[in-house]
Design a protein with these regions (language model features):
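Exposed aromatic-hydrophobic patches
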Residues: 24-26, 77-84
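Noncatalytic modules at the cell exterior or secretory-pathway interfaces
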Residues: 33-37, 84-103
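Aromatic, loop-rich ligand-recognition surfaces of beta-strand-rich domains
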Residues: 26-39, 45-48, 108
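Extended, low-complexity, turn-rich repeat/linker tracts enriched in Gly/Pro/Ser/Thr and Asp/Glu
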Residues: 41-49, 97-102
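C-terminal interaction-tip segments
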Residues: 1-22, 26-28, 95-113
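Residue-level signal for short segments within beta-strands and strand-turn junctions
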Residues: 41, 55-57, 111-113
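Solvent-exposed serine/threonine-rich low-complexity stretches and specific carbohydrate-binding patches
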Residues: 8-11, 65-74
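Short, surface-exposed beta-strand/strand-loop-strand elements in extracellular ectodomains
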Residues: 46-61, 106-108
Length: 113
């Protein structure tokens, strides 16, 4: 039996105020089957929009994971997105509605085999 494998990044995204859609860098998740992303707004303002984990088989055509959307990231709030990985590539996507001045959003992730 193979041991469970993990890959973590505590500094995947560190962004200031959101003023447009924001896409994280592509993560090659080929050997993994589950992903969790922790999205934290450490400031007091609330950027409004939806956050998603996106999936792709070819690193070109992306779809939003069903059920991964979370609305506004309130000041001081932590959101956890968790999903089974059925594609080779994954990334974070922020679908902008309106910005929260001085918001400081960070994203970390954990992949699990």
């Amino acid at each position: 039996m193979n041991p469970v494998q993990f890959r973590n990044s505590s500094d995947y995204i560190s962004a200031g105020a959101f003023g447009a859609d924001y896409t994280g860098s592509t993560i090659d998740a080929g050997q993994f089957r589950k992903i969790s992303m922790t999205v934290v707004n450490t400031a007091t303002n609330t950027p409004v929009g939806n956050i998603y984990i996106q999936f792709s088989d070819n690193d070109s055509d992306w779809i939003n994971g069903t059920g991964t959307a979370t609305a506004a990231i309130s000041g001081g709030e932590t959101n956890l997105l968790y999903f089974d990985v059925n594609s080779r590539y994954v990334r974070f996507f922020w679908d902008y509605s309106s910005a929260g001045a001085s918001s400081t959003v960070t994203v970390s992730y954990t992949l699990k085999s």
